[in-house]
A protein has these predicted regions:
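Local sequence-structure signature of Cys/Sec-based thiol-disulfide redox active-site neighborhoods
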Residues: 1-25
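Short amphipathic alpha-helix with an adjacent loop that forms part of the alpha/beta core around
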Residues: 40-46, 75
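Short alpha-helical
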Residues: 11, 37, 50, 70
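Conserved strand-to-helix beginnings and helix N-cap segments that scaffold or border functional pockets
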Residues: 14-17, 39, 68
Length: 83
């Protein structure tokens, strides 16, 4: 399962979410504005930074503010989508 921590006002979050939808990738979206524990988790994952989106993958790795190309490459590497 892929989890994305983000917020509605965040342009990079909307861009990443749109790419995931276009690729038909199912995600769990967690709004850090509505969930204080999720906001704390983002800071923990990022080593103190509040940067979003943070996308956590099934293999335990994560990406923070990825470009569309980097995000798609990661999904291909994980076998979630084809190249």
């Amino acid at each position: 399962e892929i989890t994305m921590y983000g917020a509605d006002w965040c342009g990079d979050c909307r861009r990443s979410k749109r790419l995931l939808e276009e690729l038909d990738v199912q995600i769990t979206h967690i709004d850090v504005e509505a969930d204080e524990s999720a906001a704390a988790k983002v800071v923990e994952i990022n080593g103190g930074a509040k940067s979003i989106p943070v996308i956590v993958f099934p293999d335990g790795t994560h990406m923070t503010e990825p470009s569309d190309n980097d995000l798609k490459a990661k999904l291909v590497a994980l076998g979630v989508v084809s190249a």
